[in-house]
């Protein structure tokens, strides 16, 4: 079953900037283990707080990434750079949306409906 893993990290004192660099280096490795996408976010209101996201088609692929040599090495090398325990969760997406820029407008801009091809006005 597809899902997204969210890993909440909290860096220890004065290590947040270095932790960010290290986490940004290891996060893309998830793609080699079958992830469709990954992301790392850093909180603006608490610069020690990070969220790591990785979307997988199968939970087993996540486990292979988390227990793989790259992530084990990351956790060992940087064990004093973040607080434990690290309690990640497997999440199922229930809704999503996005605005896509660069697409031509559906209407001609004259208000007469030409070019409208879908929706209630069609």
Model-assigned labels for residue ranges:
Residues 15-38, 70-74:
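Short amphipathic alpha-helical segments
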Residues 1-17, 56-62, 78-84, 88:
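Long, low-complexity, intrinsically disordered polar/charged segments
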Residues 2, 36-48, 74-122:
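Glycine-rich beta-strand-turn "strand-cap" elements at beta-sheet edges
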Residues 17-19, 50, 62-64, 98-99:
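Short acidic, gly/pro-rich beta-turn/loop elements at beta-sheet edges
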Residues 3-10, 39-69:
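Short, well-ordered beta-strand segments in beta-rich or mixed alpha/beta enzyme
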Residues 12, 65, 69, 84, ...:
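Enriched - but not universal
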């Amino acid at each position: 079953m597809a899902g997204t893993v969210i890993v909440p990290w909290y860096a220890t004192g004065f290590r947040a900037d270095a932790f960010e660099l290290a986490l940004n280096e290891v996060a893309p490795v998830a793609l080699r283990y079958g992830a469709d996408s990954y992301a790392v976010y850093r909180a603006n209101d608490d610069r020690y707080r990070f969220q790591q996201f990785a979307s997988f088609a199968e939970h087993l692929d996540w486990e292979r990434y988390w227990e793989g040599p790259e992530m084990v090495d990351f956790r060992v090398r940087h064990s004093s750079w973040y607080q434990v325990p690290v309690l990640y969760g497997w999440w199922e997406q229930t809704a999503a949306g996005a605005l896509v820029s660069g697409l031509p407008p559906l209407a001609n801009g004259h208000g007469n409906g030409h070019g409208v091809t879908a929706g209630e006005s069609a």
